[in-house]
Amino acid sequence: MTNDSASHTPSDNTEMTEMQRYVTQQRGTEPAFSGKLLHNKRTGAYHCLCCQAPLFYSDSKYDSGCGWPSFDQPVSSEAVRYLEDESHNMRRIEIRCGQCDAHLGHVFPDGPKTTGERYCVNSASLSFIDDVDGERVDG
């Protein structure tokens, strides 16, 4: 496993916010409870902010109380890539977009009984697309 840095920008060539760039390109973490998509309860899919690849469905999102959007599984085994992360004197598993390698967050083995996994994802790395009206909301 490696710790390479991501180097992709949004596919529609819009400018990223400072936080979106910090999270997706520099493996940063947004402050807990600050993300735009944390409390989103609409039905739809969460996509990579940088390349718009689908990552998580809304029915896999749950409130873990950790301060970041949490999911119990990605849309497919290819949707995310896993890397060992030993930064900050911790041992964690980093998750990145399986298509463009943008940093998303981390996965932990303390999730719900369905999968046992908690995909802790920065809102700033996601775009949400509503199933009903097609509205896109960038985190």
UniProtKB/Swiss-Prot annotation:
Enzyme superclass (EC): oxidoreductase
Organism in which the protein naturally occurs: Pectobacterium atrosepticum (strain SCRI 1043 / ATCC BAA-672) (Erwinia carotovora subsp. atroseptica)
PANTHER family: METHIONINE SULFOXIDE REDUCTASE, METHIONINE-R-SULFOXIDE REDUCTASE B1
Single Gene Ontology BP annotation: protein repair
Cofactor annotation remark: Binds 1 zinc ion per subunit. The zinc ion is important for the structural integrity of the protein.
UniProt KW Metal-binding keyword: yes
Gene from which this protein is expressed: msrB
Record-given protein name: Peptide methionine sulfoxide reductase MsrB
Pfam families the record matches: SelR
EC number: 1.8.4.12
